[in-house]
Each structure stands twice: as C-alpha cells, then as structure tokens.
Amino acid sequence: MDFNKMIPELSVFDINKTKRFYCRLGFKIEYERNDERFVFMSFQDSQFMFEQIHDDGWNTGELSYPLGRGINFSIAVEDVEEFYKLVKTLNFEIYRELTRNKYQVNGTEETQIEFLIQDPNGYLLRFTNW
C-alpha cells in the first residue's frame, strides 16, 4: 500500500461505531491497532486514520459533538451519482442533497457534482466527482 502525502487523523468517540459506519460506505480497513483503538482506512484514492479519544491524545481543547466544526472532507469518487444512490439505499441521512455547482478554476468554469453526509462523530464528508 502506498501512503498519500496527506492523511487526516481524526479523533472519534467510539472506534467500533466509526469503523462500522465507514465500512458500510465501502471503506476498507488497511490495518488497525486494537489496543490503541486506532484504524487506518481507505476508499478509492482517499485515506483516513481514526483514533478513539483518550486522555493522552493530542487534544488541543474540549472535544464534544460535533467534532470537526468548520471542516468538511472532500472525497472524490469514481461515480458520485451512483455512490449517492448507494448511500440513499443504505438509509444514511443526507446532510446536503446531490447538487451541481459551478466554480471558476484557472479561468475555466468547472462543474462539481457533490453531496454531504455526517459521520457519527459529526465530521462532514463531501463526496464529489473531482
């Protein structure tokens, strides 16, 4: 396995609940350290690390729900519209419905198709076509 140049490591309330959530979405467990309540997961070209909150962690302040305030993780998927249908059939609550947005990128107008869901810890996941 090759590691991405940037891999977010997210503090979570319950590592087992978090693993179940991400596995249902199609994420793969690459490895885990059960004694440390840590898991490394991947999905297509994205990678995440999750660690259950503990007193010895790198906690910069009080950690309360929702975690990740002000952050959303943009995850490019191969077919965002098909993935959206899958997420709907799994009965995940949609935070923001599938939308098409136009953005200026280096003088060119690009269309991004995206939708958002929220994980059990409060992190926003934005699935996109790019």
Predicted regions and their residues:
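Short, flexible turn/loop "capping" segments at secondary-structure junctions
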Residues: 1-2, 65-67
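Core segments of cupin and vicinal oxygen chelate
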Residues: 2, 9-49
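A short, local hydrophobic-aromatic micro-motif
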Residues: 4-6, 95-96
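Exposed loop/turn and edge beta-strand positions of beta-sandwich/beta-sheet ligand-binding modules
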Residues: 6, 35, 67-69, 111
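Short active-site oxyanion
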Residues: 6-7, 28, 70-73
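A cross-family glycoside hydrolase active-site/sugar-binding cleft signature
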Residues: 9, 51, 74-76, 97, ...
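Vicinal oxygen chelate
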Residues: 13-16, 71-121
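Conserved short beta-strand elements that form part of the metal-binding/catalytic scaffold
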Residues: 30-64, 124-129
